[in-house]
Amino acid sequence: MGREIMDMPAPAADARLHYGSDALQFGDLRLPPGPGPHPVAIVMHGGFWRARYNLDHIGHLCAALTGAGIATWSLEYRRVGNPGGGWPGTLLDAALGADYVRELAGKHHLDLAKVISIGHSAGGHLALWLAARRKIPQGDALAGANPLALHGAVSLAGVVDLRRGWDLRLGDGAVAELMGGPPEKLAGRYHTASPIELVPLGIKVRLLHGTEDSVVPIEISNNYQKAASRAGDDALMWVLGGADHFAVIDPRSEHWGKVEATVRALLA
């Protein structure tokens, strides 16, 4: 197993729908059988926010969750290297796509009281950021008028602390590419874009991270969990012994059961 999941064709979605006017503002919707209303997972793919990594590889996770009775709305978004990608466009696309669940709910029988976000790697950053949007003050470039309320959020080996990601030069400087520069020069941007700086969120947050992750150090998830708990959040972390960076998105992995159980528990 391992990184090969990135290159394996995933099961097809039920529908590919645009949430905005740009060619990259779309999502893949997968629906479980039955009349609903269905709980929903908004899924954010990883790839260090870079254009060369799209949503295809996260389709395996989406299909597995949908097989467990959860509707999945997997978002594509403009990334670094795409026109309009990077700060703020990447984050605003995530926000626009998440809010579009309201438009999908009626036709597709989705339960707006049971919506969570889940993301992997850079997508873990976006998933927790979506849960924090209500903390962003009006007037900020990332502020939204009426962000969709989430019931919980899950980070799978996520880059949930952008300042630390900058310090460690994750992905050979991926945070700098996303944000447009260092935190000492762009403190305001980092403050409203980095999930760890927006705690407490007031919802349940779950973090899963493998001990053998050589892409995103486990310390980033550990530090977020400690900061969120100190701030009063219900934030729990599971350390997955022997798991690499990609095991958490691979339904064939021995660790997949913990991922699925975590999502199901949040939506129970």
PLM features: what roles do these ranges have?
Residues M1-P35:
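N-terminal cap/lid segment of alpha/beta-hydrolase-fold proteins
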Residues R52-L61, S74-K114:
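Catalytic nucleophile-loop/oxyanion-hole region of alpha/beta-hydrolase
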Residues L207-H209, D213:
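Short beta-strand/loop motif that positions the catalytic acidic residue
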Residues S214-N223:
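Conserved alpha/beta-hydrolase "acid-adjacent" motif
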